[in-house]
């Protein structure tokens, strides 16, 4: 093998290695990314059962129901649409009706009940998750005071 052929083989091997590494990184990111949706987004474009997403909005008034165990059922709304949610675990101390919440999980087999494995609640009386507030402002259903922090 000549010097030129060796150099070409090393370059081709390096490019191949980099391509495989990039594909592995993209594959790993694709499995861990959870896209953010509001209930009205899901009403327009439903996602398939088992698809991991983040669902944000307000906890609907009168929707929180606690089972005998640690399972809680509630609904998330954005003023336009509502999505029923179940969560098994300990809720954040600041979780309550009418407050901002972001949940992460998957839709069940029926595609209508959202099974959350993570629930994030607002921090204080003036806070709403930025992505929720921005989307509600964009959709024209924002009823809060001031700007989202």
From Swiss-Prot:
It is a single-pass type II membrane protein. The chain crosses the membrane at residues 8-28. Gene3D superfamilies: Nucleic acid-binding proteins. Residues 1-7 are cytoplasmic. Keywords: Cell inner membrane, Cell membrane, Cytochrome c-type biogenesis, Heme, Iron, Membrane, Metal-binding, Signal-anchor, Transmembrane, Transmembrane helix. It is found in: Cell inner membrane. Pfam families: CcmE. Residues 29-149 are periplasmic. GO terms for molecular function: heme binding; metal ion binding. Heme binds at residues 123, 127. One of its GO terms (cellular component) is plasma membrane. GO terms for biological process: cytochrome complex assembly. InterPro entries: CcmE (IPR004329), CcmE-like_sf (IPR036127), NA-bd_OB-fold (IPR012340). Heme chaperone required for the biogenesis of c-type cytochromes. Transiently binds heme delivered by CcmC and transfers the heme to apo-cytochromes in a process facilitated by CcmF and CcmH. NCBIfam families: PRK13254.1-1, PRK13254.1-5. Belongs to the CcmE/CycJ family. This is Cytochrome c-type biogenesis protein CcmE. The lineage of its organism: Bacteria, Pseudomonadati, Pseudomonadota, Alphaproteobacteria, Hyphomicrobiales.
């Amino acid at each position: 093998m000549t010097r030129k052929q060796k150099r070409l083989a090393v370059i081709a091997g390096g490019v191949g290695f980099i391509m495989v590494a990039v594909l592995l990184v993209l594959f790993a990111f694709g499995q861990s990314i959870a896209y953010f949706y509001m209930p009205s987004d899901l009403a327009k474009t439903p996602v398939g059962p088992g698809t991991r997403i983040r669902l944000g909005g307000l906890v609907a008034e009168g929707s929180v129901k606690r089972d005998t165990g640690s399972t809680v059922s509630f609904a998330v709304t954005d003023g336009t649409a509502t999505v029923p949610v179940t969560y098994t675990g300990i809720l954040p101390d600041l979780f309550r009706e009418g407050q901002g919440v972001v949940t992460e999980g998957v839709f069940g087999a029926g595609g209508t009940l959202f099974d959350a494995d993570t629930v994030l609640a607002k921090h204080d009386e003036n806070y709403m998750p930025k992505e929720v507030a921005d989307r509600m402002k964009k959709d024209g259903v924002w009823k809060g005071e001031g700007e989202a922090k």
